[in-house]
Amino acid sequence: MRIFSLIVAGLVLLIQLYPAWGTLYRRFLCKKMNGQCEAECFTFEQKIGTCQANFLCCRKRKEH
């Protein structure tokens, strides 16, 4: 019974870590595309309440 609870605890930890892998993968893709990840919404989208995060929305980096 103790082994079962340890397995369940391990699965819960893996489930919580899964979104972190997605974030790392998106950052890798954006770096590969020479851009930076942007998950912020435009001002007008926030006002009308239709803000959706585009996970692969990469824009070119601005050179200063």
Swiss-Prot record:
Tell me the GO BP annotations in alphabetical order: defense response to bacterium
Where does it primarily localize?
secreted
Q: Where in the cell is it found?
A: Secreted
Q: Which GO terms describe its cellular component?
A: extracellular region
Q: What S-S linkages are listed for this chain?
A: C30-C57, C37-C51, C41-C58
UniProt cross-references to InterPro entries, sorted A to Z: Defensin_beta-like
Q: What does this protein do?
A: Has antibacterial activity.
Stated family: Belongs to the beta-defensin family.
Q: What is this protein called?
A: Beta-defensin 13
